[in-house]
Each structure stands twice: as structure tokens, then as C-alpha cells.
A protein has these predicted regions:
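Glycine/serine-rich phosphate-binding loop and adjoining beta1-alpha1 elements at the start
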Residues: 2-40, 71-79, 84-206
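Adenosine-phosphate binding glycine-rich loop
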Residues: 11-24, 40-44, 48, 52, ...
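Gly/Ser/Thr-rich loops at beta-strand to alpha-helix junctions
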Residues: 48-55, 75-79, 125-127, 215
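Glycine-rich phosphate/diphosphate-binding loop of Rossmann-like nucleotide-binding domains
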Residues: 49-67, 182, 186-260, 266-271
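A short helix->loop->beta-strand "cap" motif at the edges of active sites that frequently abuts
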Residues: 66-67, 92, 137-141, 165-167, ...
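ADP-ribose/adenylate-binding Rossmann-like module
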Residues: 73, 119-124, 135-151, 270, ...
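A short, aliphatic-rich alpha-helical micro-motif
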Residues: 113-114, 203, 255-261, 279-283
């Protein structure tokens, strides 16, 4: 039994789903094979990913593989109500409503887990947290699962070290087919797409501060530079800071960057990146947003406590008027901007990421009997297969090593 906002929205969602399906060729090829082989026959899969059209396509592919699929979101603001209605119309149990409270969001996750899944797809680690706590009784059939994000993998590794990981988990985010493309090119494009659409402001000529120079931060900084911004990078890792410097970005601590930035984007996966001491020195009408998974990177609660007025400025933008008259603008309540006020990554990018998810779930199902409760890396053969399929779909080809070259690379003699 689904829980969605309004079934009359289904036609709009169906259009969105069909559109992205036409631009996800790697997943289409997997779907064709799954339809014949049914690798998930008799298995139930719970999927907690941003509930929009690309995720819907993944759900349909898994269903073609024989799975009983149950979909939910992974963020209170990223669910698209028309897509949730469309998936319900297509016969997939779906639990998602845009704009729910944190408690309502957790309740939707719990409803999803009542299917007692054999496999899970997690994005940020919320399902696995529930299965290791409040919903431990619903994990009795668990074979394993996949985690989509850097943040989620950090949580998984911490659980593994503490000996409380409920089941084997695949670190999908660490796959080459995922983080090289999704994190860099997907986040780079979708973050700026959301910022520009929401603010309707120029990027060129602005001083943009990017907090974090991991794969996501690299993409965000690269696209800002390409659109004519002066980019400052804030980092805690000396080598990432050096890398940013070599790419001709200015590097400085946030305490200094806060004084000169026009637009701030966090992408660290950590908490308290921009806090009250930074708000105190920011320019009037500075813009703040977050592209990390959780809403703890910009301390919006501290900003609200300092403000004498909190008011809407545009859809997706709140203004915070401070005692000295300055206004600071926060996008999407400090939640991940590219999905809370945007459409997420391009379909062609998620084609690769969700291909990794689909094949990793298949791998878990096949190897279920020999797995330990730990974090596994995606096998190289899955990564390579997806890379080659994507190249072929783009009409590209590459060279192949000869046997002599393979022997040379494997040997120690010249």
C-alpha cells in the first residue's frame, strides 16, 4: 500500500520517467538481460534514494529482474510527488511525500521496511540505521545492500568498526563508474542548475566559495570557474588544497573566505562548516547553500537564532535579517540544493550510477552465502563492464592491450 500525496499527479510523473528512460542506455541494456534471467526472482528490494524520475527507472529495472520493489525517498525535500504517484500507478509500492517533517520522513522509511527486504539500496545510510536500531526486527531476511553516497559509506565503515553493521554492504560510491562521473560531473552540473534556476542571478563576476575539494567540490568549483566566477576553495586536507591551487583556485580558511564571498556552496559531508562566526562577517545579501547529503553543513539554526527576521524571498530562498541590517540568503533550508530545489543529476550520469546499483545487487544475490557483515568494494569487472557499455552507447571505442603489452606490464624485466 503506497503513501503518496496525490494520484492525479501521475500523468506528469509518467512523462518524466519515460523521458529519462530514453537517455539511460546502460540501464536499458541491464533491464533487457534482467527481463530474461530474473536474477531477483523471489526477492524483495527496498530502495531509499531521492524519489524522482531516474530513481523510478532503477525501480522498474529491478522489477523486471523479478524483484518485489518498494520505493521511498532519502530526504524530506527531494521527493517529487508526481513521480511517486506515477510509480504507484505502475504498481510499485511507493512511500514518499515532498516537504514532510523529519518524523514523518522516518515513518515513511519504516513503512517501506515493513516489506522485510532481502536487499536494500540506501542513500545516506538512513535505512541501515533503522535496520540496526528501531527496525531491527524487519531485517531478518537481509542478504545485503548498496550505499550510494560518501556520507553513507562513512556511516557504514563506522558501524563495521563497532561491530554493528546489520548486513553486508556494497560501497557503490567508491566505484569508478560512480564517483568519477556522478560526484564530479553530476554534482557540478546539477548544483549550478539548481542555484541559477532558484536565484535567477549571474555567476560570472561573483566570488564563489566552495567548501570541500573532494569529487563533488571539484565539479562545483570547475563549473563555477567555467561560468566566469572567481573561485575560492576551503579545505582541511593539505593535498586537496594543493590540488585546488594547481587548478588555479584560491585557497584560504573559511574564516577569511567568509569576508569576501558572494555565494557559498558546501560539499564536505561534515557538520558546522559555516557557523555563526562566519555569518558575522559576511557581505549583505550573501547566498548560502549546501550540496552535501545532510543539512548540517550550514548552521541554519544558529543563523535563525541571530536573525531579527526570517522571511521568504523567492521560492526556495529564505532571507535572514541580522541586527545590523544585513540579509543572508539560504537556499533550500540548507538541504542538498541540487535535489531540494532542482531536478538532480542528469539522466546520462545517473545511468552509470544506477547501473552500478543494479549489478551490485545482482552480485550480492548471487554470492549471498559467502558474505560477511562488512563493507565490500564493487568488483572491478562490474566497473569495467559499465564503462565499456557507456562508451559503446556514446558511439566511442578505445584501444585494447595486446598480450605482449599485458605481459610487459605484469613483468619485472624490461
Amino acid at each position: 500500500m503506497s503513501i503518496v500525496k496525490d494520484m492525479s499527479l501521475a500523468p506528469s510523473g509518467l512523462q518524466k520517467i519515460q523521458w529519462v528512460r530514453d537517455f539511460m542506455p546502460a540501464l536499458s541494456g541491464i533491464e533487457e538481460r534482467f527481463r530474461k534471467e530474473k536474477p531477483f526472482a523471489g526477492l524483495t528490494i527496498a530502495v531509499s534514494v531521492h524519489l524522482e524520475a531516474k530513481t523510478a527507472n532503477l525501480g522498474l529495472v529491478l522489477r523486471e529482474g523479478g524483484a518485489d520493489v518498494h520505493l521511498t525517498g532519502c530526504n524530506p525535500l527531494s521527493t517529487q510527488d508526481d513521480v511517486a504517484a506515477a510509480m504507484t500507478h505502475l504498481g510499485v509500492d511507493t512511500y514518499g511525500v515532498h516537504g514532510v517533517t523529519p518524523q514523518e520522513y522516518e515513518d515513511l522509511l519504516v513503512e517501506t521496511l515493513k516489506c522485510r527486504p532481502h536487499l536494500i539500496v540506501d542513500d545516506g545510510g538512513d535505512l541501515i540505521s533503522l535496520l540496526g536500531g528501531r527496525c531491527a526486527d524487519l531485517g531478518e531476511r537481509l542478504i545485503g545492500g548498496c550505499e550510494e553516497t560518501t556520507t553513507g559509506i562513512h556511516r557504514l565503515i563506522a558501524r563495521e568498526k563497532a561491530g554493528i553493521l546489520p548486513c553486508p554492504m556494497m560501497a557503490v560510491n567508491d566505484a569508478k563508474a560512480k564517483h568519477y562521473y556522478d560526484n564530479k560531473y553530476g554534482t557540478g552540473q546539477s548544483t549550478w542548475d539548481a542555484i541559477m534556476h532558484t536565484t535567477n542571478l549571474m555567476v560570472a563576476g561573483k566570488t564563489v566559495v566552495v567548501a570541500g575539494y573532494g569529487w563533488c567540490g571539484k565539479g562545483i568549483a570547475m563549473r563555477a570557474k567555467g561560468m566566469g566566477a572567481h573561485v575560492i576553495v576551503c579545505e582541511v586536507d593539505p593535498f586537496k588544497a594543493l590540488e585546488a591551487t594547481m587548478e588555479n583556485f584560491q585557497v584560504m580558511p573559511m574564516d577569511e573566505a567568509a569576508k569576501v564571498g558572494d555565494l557559498f556552496v558546501t560539499a564536505t559531508g561534515c557538520k558546522d562548516v559555516i557557523v555563526d562566526r562566519h555569518f558575522a562577517v559576511m557581505k549583505h545579501n550573501a547566498i548560502l547553500c549546501n550540496s552535501g547529503h545532510f543539512d548540517c553543513e550550514v548552521d541554519v539554526a544558529a543563523l535563525a537564532a541571530e536573525a531579527v527576521e526570517r522571511f521568504p524571498r523567492r521560492e526556495g530562498i529564505e532571507g535572514f535579517r541580522l541586527k545590523d541590517g544585513r540579509i543572508l540568503n539560504v537556499l533550500a533550508q540548507g538541504r542538498l540544493v541540487n535535489l531540494a530545489v532542482g531536478n538532480g543529476h542528469p539522466a546520462e550520469i545517473m545511468d552509470m550510477s544506477f547501473a552500478v546499483q543494479a549489478l551490485s545487487l545482482e552480485w550480492l544475490a548471487k554470492h549471498r552465502d559467502g558474505l560477511e557483515k562488512k563493507v565490500y568494494q564493487v568488483p572491478d569487472e562490474i566497473d569495467d563492464q559499465i564503462g565499456r557499455v557507456k562508451l559503446a552507447a556514446m558511439g566511442l571505442s578505445i584501444d585494447t592491450l595486446t598480450q605482449e603489452q599485458k605481459d610487459y606490464l605484469a613483468g619485472w624485466e624490461a
